[in-house]
Amino acid sequence: MLIIAGLGNPGSKYAGNRHNIGFMAVDAIWQRQGFSSWSKKFKAEIAEGEIAGERVLLIKPQTFMNLSGEAVGEAMRFYKLAPKDIVVIYDELDLIAGKARIKIGGGHGGHNGIKSIDAHCGKEYRRLRLGIGHPGVKDLVHAHVLGDFAKADQAWLSSLLDTIADNAGMLVKGEDSQLMNKIALATGGKPDAEEPQAPKKQVGQSHIHKARNAAQPKKLPATGPMADMLKKMFGSKGD
């Protein structure tokens, strides 16, 4: 069994936030892979299903970001799983918008949701980081992370979410390199591109208060089933 946890903040107020891209990714998998209806358990919304012959639990913690580990840890212990049986999907300022990276273990990078999961589950779980870019100025980071994606972001965002949902079997089977290649090709990146070097992080700061290298997302054609959902989500919002 595998737990796939998407991180975000609960409620319609935060639904379109960049910080909620983890929720969006899990919603896309749920929509594409034919899971059960969402229900409430473990301080979270959960749905059960099967991907690539493996039983999978999708989970969206409803504790708010900083306490995400309470929900994921409770589910892990209930099903008698180990950190290796968990995949966490979340936003990453260190990555250009639309890029993705996956790894096992590592530091929390100032992300309070990851810090909480580390505390409740240990560190040796898989982390799928989805780039949301950086606004370029430290003072704008908080508003950027807790602000909605702009209409101009919908094309790459739709492609990214579609690709994750379509290739969820790769995520479940641990075919990480293949999945990264699929995402890079779908979002206009280079499959083997080297991840840019991030500046040294300051201890004790939340990632929404850090200054990081600025990078602008590419505009891509809006295609795929997720496009309509995103248009509904952001249609009434300005850029």
Swiss-Prot record:
The record marks 91 as: Stabilizes the basic form of H active site to accept a proton. It is found in: Cytoplasm. The keyword Protein biosynthesis does not apply. SUPFAM superfamilies: Peptidyl-tRNA hydrolase-like (SSF53178). Monomer. Hydrolyzes ribosome-free peptidyl-tRNAs (with 1 or more amino acids incorporated), which drop off the ribosome during protein synthesis, or as a result of ribosome stalling. Catalyzes the release of premature peptidyl moieties from peptidyl-tRNA molecules trapped in stalled 50S ribosomal subunits, and thus maintains levels of free tRNAs and 50S ribosomes. This is Peptidyl-tRNA hydrolase.
